[in-house]
Amino acid sequence: MSLRIGLIGAGRHGSRYIHHLLHDLPGVSLAALCRKRIGEGRPSSLTTEVPIYEDYRALIADPSVEAVVVVTLPSIHPEICLESVRAGKPILIEKPLASTGREARMMVAAVEEAGLLLMTAQTLRFDSSILLLKEHWPKIGQCRYATFTSRIEAKADTSFRLPLPNQRGALLEFGIHLLDAVSFLTGEEVVSVRCELDQLPCVGPDTMAIVQLQTTSGMRFVLDIARVVKGRVARTEWVGPHGQISADWFHQHVSGTLSDGAPLEWTVQPQQTILSTLRAFVHAIETNSPPPITGRDGCRAVEVADACYRSAELGGAIVSVARDTREA
């Protein structure tokens, strides 16, 4: 019997989930879909007779839906999460888990109290280049410092939309990948940050962020995050006493050099990260086991983002990151 999943969100990113749920997951079916602009008709990728709801509450209440996947704006993640908790259904939520650490902590607390499964779709963790980097960067010794660069083209369909009050921008939207990657790759928590933004949320959504992070053991990272007109960049470079290593997850390339002069290069077998994320979610449900990226993981990344925004408000001051995901 197949696992029946309800998908909330059918935009550009949500359509990728639709495709995988329809075609790439044996034993899984798309039981229902919720889209905000229901008047636009059925998504072109939806080739089967799947019921479409305009209200996410109706989808979650649908008895044919056994688990929920959410690909919407983070501003409504908390209410969707709580509705899933009330219905007793496991839930996968696209990054960022929430707009603020306070909301994320509330979501995690509700899910844990109910004994339900919450997975955060930090999809970069499944990227082949990132996984190779995680495996091989210890060859360079204790990391002295590392840099991450993520520049993504501005969305062509959002220029006419008015931003929400105090809406966060690039740092939270896709920079959250990097904030999470530091902990994922090092196995350490980020304990302090410094951040500069091109504009604060009270003025408008940020489109550029320069962030300095420090982990528990003192490793230092510099993050360059920006919306650009053209030319995507997605790379990281690590420097240690025994060499350096770099990864490019846009061009799928990992290489390095050790202190003995030996060049290093690895063959990257690209993976479809959304598909890998869905498989992990399904496996966690079917085996009643913790997901590889928990709600607490997603919460922690949002808490680091909180500290970054606070630092920017303070003119780039060093700000400590809260440690307790259950802290109010």
Predicted feature residues:
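Rossmann-fold dehydrogenase core element
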Residues: 106-123, 141-146
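Contiguous beta-strand/loop segments that form the cofactor/metal-binding neighborhood of enzyme cores
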Residues: 179-252, 278-289, 320, 327-328
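Predominantly a Rossmann-like dinucleotide-binding segment in NAD(P)-dependent oxidoreductases
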Residues: 124-202, 315
